[in-house]
C-alpha cells in the first residue's frame, strides 16, 4: 500500500493544520484540508505550509469544507480525524464519512486520550479493523513523537504498515502504546505538570506559580518550566487531559491529577493561557514599550510582576552545568537540604517512578517512556535521570531517603525498579541546561 492522498478533518485546528503540513511535506501526499468553512480552510493551508517552513508544499494542500468530505474521503488512502476532543463531535464526523471510506483505507484519529476502542466501535463493523490512534505532539516539526495506538479490532498488518510509514516517510519517533488513559507521553508529562500546579497552591505564600517554576526550570531537564507549559498548551486542554486521567485510572498517583481550584477559576474567566494572552502568566507592555511578564497570584486572584528568584542550589547547579561538571551539579542538588532543593529533587525522583509505572501499563518496552518524553515533550528521559543521579542503586537510596514512607509504600519501590534496563539510550547531558 502507498499513501498518496490524505484527508485531514478539522484541519484549521492547531494539530490538524500542523499535521497537514507534515503529511504534505515529509509524506509528499496530496492533502485535503477539511474545515467547517472554506475561509477557515484557505487560512489553514497558508498556516500549514508555514509550519513546516516549506511554502512550496502549498500545491499539495487542497482547501475543503465538510460538505466536500464524501468526495475527499473516497479518494483518500488515509483519513486523519482531528476535531474537538469529545465523543459526540467525533461520532458526528464518523457518521458523515463512514459510507464513503474505501475498505483498504486507513482511518486514524489524532485524539490525545479518548478511548481508541470506544471510538472504533462507532464505526461500522467492516471498518473497525482499519481504525487506529495516531497521536502527534505539537509542534510536530520539532517534536517528532508519534504514538500509535491500535484498538482491539485493529488489523495487525495495517498497524505495522502505519508504524513503518510514520517512521520512514514522516520521519517520526514511533512508539506503540496500549489504549490506556492519555496513552503514555501525556500521562507522564501531565502528572508532573499538574502536581507542580498543586505545589504552587501549597506554596502560594512563598510565591506560588513562578516560585515552583523557578525551582523546576531548564536546569532540571526541560525546555520550559512545568506550569508555564500548562499555560502554553492551554488551561482548557490541560483540564481535559488531567480530568480524563483522574476519571480513568486508579494508580498510586491518581490524586496528583486533581485540577487545582485556581486553574478552574481562570478557565471560568476565559483566561486560558498563552493562546488568549492571559492565564497563569501574561505579558504587559509598559508606557516605555518594554515587555514585562506578570504571573497570577493565587492568594489575591490578581496579577503581579514575575519574581526573579535566587536559590543557592540552583545557582551552584547552573554554574556547574556551564562548566560541564555534571557530577558537581547533581551533588549540589543532592547535598542541599533547603526546601527548594528538596522539592526539586523529589520531583525528579517522582518523575522517574511514575514514568516507569505508566510505561509498564502502556508498553512492553521500558525505553518507550524515554522516547516519549525526549521526543514528545523535549524533557530529559526518565531513565536518563537515573543515570544523572548516579545509577540505579544511588537512585533507590535517594528515593528511600527523600520520599515519605506512605508514598513509598504505595509506589512499591523495589518492585517498580525491578528489571530496569542498564541505562538510557539518551545522554542526559544534552537535556540539563545551564539556565533557570
Regions found by a protein language model. Give the residues of each.
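N-terminal glycine-rich phosphate-binding loop for ADP-containing cofactors
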Residues: 1-436
Amino acid at each position: 500500500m502507498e499513501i498518496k492522498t490524505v484527508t485531514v478533518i478539522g484541519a484549521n485546528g492547531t494539530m490538524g493544520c500542523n499535521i497537514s503540513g507534515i503529511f504534505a511535506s515529509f509524506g509528499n501526499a496530496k492533502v485535503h484540508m477539511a474545515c467547517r468553512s472554506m475561509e477557515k480552510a484557505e487560512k489553514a493551508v497558508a498556516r500549514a505550509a508555514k509550519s513546516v517552513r516549506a511554502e512550496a508544499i502549498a500545491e499539495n494542500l487542497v482547501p475543503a469544507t465538510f460538505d466536500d468530505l464524501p468526495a475527499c474521503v473516497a479518494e483518500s488512502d488515509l483519513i486523519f480525524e482531528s476535531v474537538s476532543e469529545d465523543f459526540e463531535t467525533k461520532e458526528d464526523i464518523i457518521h458523515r464519512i463512514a459510507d464513503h471510506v474505501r475498505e483498504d483505507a486507513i482511518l486514524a484519529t489524532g485524539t490525545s486520550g479518548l478511548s481508541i476502542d470506544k471510538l472504533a466501535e462507532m464505526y461500522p463493523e467492516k471498518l473497525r479493523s482499519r481504525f487506529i490512534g495516531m497521536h502527534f505532539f505539537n509542534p510536530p516539526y520539532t517534536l517528532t513523537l508519534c504514538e500509535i495506538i491500535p484498538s482491539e479490532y485493529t488489523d495487525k498488518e495495517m498497524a505495522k504498515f502505519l508504524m513503518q510509514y510514520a517512521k520512514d516517510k514522516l520521519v517520526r519517533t514511533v512508539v506503540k502504546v496500549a489504549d490506556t488513559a492519555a496513552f503514555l507521553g501525556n500521562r507522564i508529562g501531565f502528572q508532573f505538570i499538574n502536581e507542580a500546579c498543586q505545589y504552587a497552591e501549597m506554596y502560594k505564600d512563598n510565591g506560588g506559580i513562578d516560585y515552583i517554576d523557578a525551582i523546576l526550570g531548564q536546569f532540571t531537564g526541560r525546555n520550559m518550566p512545568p506550569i508555564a507549559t500548562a499555560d502554553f498548551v492551554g488551561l482548557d486542554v490541560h483540564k481535559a487531559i488531567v480530568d480524563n486521567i483522574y476519571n480513568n485510572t486508579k494508580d498510586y498517583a491518581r490524586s496528583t491529577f486533581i485540577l487545582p481550584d485556581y486553574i478552574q477559576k481562570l478557565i471560568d474567566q476565559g483566561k486560558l493561557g498563552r493562546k488568549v494572552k492571559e492565564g497563569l502568566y501574561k505579558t504587559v507592555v509598559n508606557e516605555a514599550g518594554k515587555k514585562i511578564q506578570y504571573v497570577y497570584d493565587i492568594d489575591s486572584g490578581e496579577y503581579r510582576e514575575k519574581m526573579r528568584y535566587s536559590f543557592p542550589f540552583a545557582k551552584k547547579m547552573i554554574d556547574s552545568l556551564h562548566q560541564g561538571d555534571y557530577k558537581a551539579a547533581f551533588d549540589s542538588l543532592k547535598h542541599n537540604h533547603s526546601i527548594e532543593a528538596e522539592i526539586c529533587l523529589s520531583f525528579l525522583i517522582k518523575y522517574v517512578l511514575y514514568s516507569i509505572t505508566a510505561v509498564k501499563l502502556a508498553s512492553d518496552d521500558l525505553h518507550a517512556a524515554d522516547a516519549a518524553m525526549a521526543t514528545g515533550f523535549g524533557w530529559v528521559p526518565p531513565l536518563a535521570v537515573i543515570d544523572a543521579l548516579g545509577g540505579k542503586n544511588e537512585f533507590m537510596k535517594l528515593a528511600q531517603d527523600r520520599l515519605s514512607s506512605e508514598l513509598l509504600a504505595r509506589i512499591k519501590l523495589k518492585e517498580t525498579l525491578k528489571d530496569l534496563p542498564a541505562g538510557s539510550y539518551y545522554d542526559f547531558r544534552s537535556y540539563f541546561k545551564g539556565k533557570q
